[in-house]
């Protein structure tokens, strides 16, 4: 891959993808049960063997298109292998944020994690630790009173969706405060990568950090060009965080001077903006519409002389707003063409959650055949991946990837 001056270079949603972050599906998916899957934000239980096969097709398409793949488990391993002290610090922080309360169990877990190779330790942290894996473990009174479950350390099945814990914006990142407690531990990995990894530790500004007051998730962060962002206000991202991100970007004198905040309904089906709205070509977007799906649009700009943010509500349609701020006419391809039945079905299975690997070239789930056909009829090249198992987590190709470097357009 050609060299870039910065390890993060994201100034669009569609520039040719050069480097991306993924996670290989692991044993964490095997630790989901019907009794706990809702708590972990899954609507069904994926079959790991097939999920891995589907994910490998995804990775193969990326590689065949000359995209360099980093895996988050490999990056954190490269961080921890450099220092025993750092490994011990990471173990202690991970256990603390897993809310282990008794000194006895904390010490058992420290000994257990330290006994593993770093790669196996990271895999086990993601997949979860059950009581039988800790020798000499006994339930405390607190465990018995509060009904401790099978897991001492809960699994993290949503690590599959690398889009959300941090997001690349320009040459920096937001390390996100996740909306649900069950996902907050995922951001420890990003914290250590951007603080300690030799490639990233001194070269990547942090626009927002993981302990902010309000939640922000990467599925709501879209970079349209060097001056324009679209941020969703959704089930998972709060308005406060959008304003705080705007302040950070403006005061750090980045190239971004306008943020469009798209408010969407707080609904499980539309958990992030990118489940209903993504860019796929210079002037082409895909979106889902229904009776209960609407966009309220707010514009945030900065006045350097007064150091204040100006916020106004747009009254125009989304298409007209985007055309104005992009300076060109845009088209929107509706999920399944707006069909009431196919549109709802395909949006539920991430028909709008596609990953652009170049202008007018995307990766999409094969199951969304109506929407995919519409894309092709409108000149979009579609790489299809199987998704009978991956789709059970309610995330598509965009959700499963975090671009690190795109070519500028």
UniProtKB/Swiss-Prot annotation:
Covalent S-S links between cysteines: none
Pathway in which the depicted protein is active: Amino-acid degradation; L-arginine degradation via ADI pathway; carbamoyl phosphate from L-arginine: step 1/2
Catalytic residues, chain numbering: 399
BP term (GO), one: arginine deiminase pathway
InterPro entries: Arg_deiminase
Entry similarity comment: Belongs to the arginine deiminase family.
The protein, known as: Arginine deiminase
